UniProtKB/Swiss-Prot annotation:
<dbReference type="GO" id="GO:0031514">
    <property type="term" value="C:motile cilium"/>
</dbReference>
<keyword id="KW-0282">Flagellum</keyword>
<feature type="coiled-coil region">
    <location>
        <begin position="142"/>
        <end position="188"/>
    </location>
</feature>
<feature type="coiled-coil region">
    <location>
        <begin position="255"/>
        <end position="330"/>
    </location>
</feature>
<dbReference type="GO" id="GO:0005737">
    <property type="term" value="C:cytoplasm"/>
</dbReference>
<dbReference type="GO" id="GO:0005634">
    <property type="term" value="C:nucleus"/>
</dbReference>
<protein>
    <recommendedName>
        <fullName>Cilia- and flagella-associated protein 36</fullName>
    </recommendedName>
</protein>
<keyword id="KW-0966">Cell projection</keyword>
<feature type="region of interest" description="Disordered">
    <location>
        <begin position="281"/>
        <end position="318"/>
    </location>
</feature>
<dbReference type="InterPro" id="IPR042541">
    <property type="entry name" value="BART_sf"/>
</dbReference>
<keyword id="KW-0963">Cytoplasm</keyword>
<feature type="compositionally biased region" description="Basic and acidic residues">
    <location>
        <begin position="281"/>
        <end position="313"/>
    </location>
</feature>
<keyword id="KW-0539">Nucleus</keyword>
<dbReference type="Pfam" id="PF11527">
    <property type="entry name" value="ARL2_Bind_BART"/>
</dbReference>
<keyword id="KW-0969">Cilium</keyword>
<comment type="similarity">
    <text>Belongs to the CFAP36 family.</text>
</comment>
<feature type="compositionally biased region" description="Polar residues">
    <location>
        <begin position="187"/>
        <end position="200"/>
    </location>
</feature>
Amino acid sequence: MASDTEWVLESVLGFVSGPVWTVPVLEFMEQKCSVFDDEEENKLSYTEIHNEYKELVETLLTQHLNEVGISEEQFQEACTAPLAHSATLKTILQPVLAVEDFKIFKAMMVQKNIELQLQAIRIIQERNGVLPDCLQHGRDIISDLEQQEMKLVSEALRLSKEEYEREQLRRSAKELNLTLGEHSENKQSSGSERTPNNTELPVKTQKEEKQPVNMLESPYKEVSIKLKEMSNTEAAEAWLEQARKEAGILSSVTNLSQAEKEQLQKRAEYLRRRREELLAKKQESKKMAQNSEEHEEKATCSKQEMTEEEKKSLQRRKRLAEKLKEEVILSCEKSGSAS
């Protein structure tokens, strides 16, 4: 039983490695893979293309199994055997397994789409020496935007932390002031003269502590007032918004994101056109190869026909030479008998 499974798998592996399988399957993938991307959402066109792929593979496999004499049950058993799910064989049998597994089919088509795009980019770069602008600068714009956003977020978090620390410092100073105020009132009721001097010290200390706080608060006065009533997350968002407004890049970021979308669309359209041209050239070269093969076959046939005609003419010449030889011999014999 195991030997039968190995024999069936060996036959299928040999078939999927040959041109009868690879040529139509690769041609189908190259023509249909342009609509596939790596997004999680599956489009309706994916299902239609998958059904077309099923029909193609089933037709090719059925022809091979009938020629070799393998039944459908034997083929199913071989595909479900543990040997078929090994890492090496699974990679080779991926186009066959993609008939029943849509995830494998989609991953295979996405990979082929990426390969064609990279191939088109290499051809463009080899032909022109450099890449067009629509393929060259789009990623730099995105990275610059990401760096600006990260700087703004870091700045907002830093300012939020400083504001939180200042708020804690103000609360501690306020509590200390209230405690000392109560203590001074108790001292005043007992008629102590040291209390005013003692109370002036923390008040003065509080003023001295407030001075650097006010200097730090001045660039972000409005946001600092609001942050007193906000949580840490809300404070970070407020600082981010304020930092964007003060840097004057809020509108530019929005514009750049739109420009980036247009740039990506141009890039995708450009690659699509180049890929279509590449596929058209492949089809044209394939037709030229087929035509040349047909011409060679016709030339070979004509040579064979000429050879047959030459053989016939040689046979006629031989017969004629034999007749002439016989006539010469007869004439010689007659002349000898006459003498």
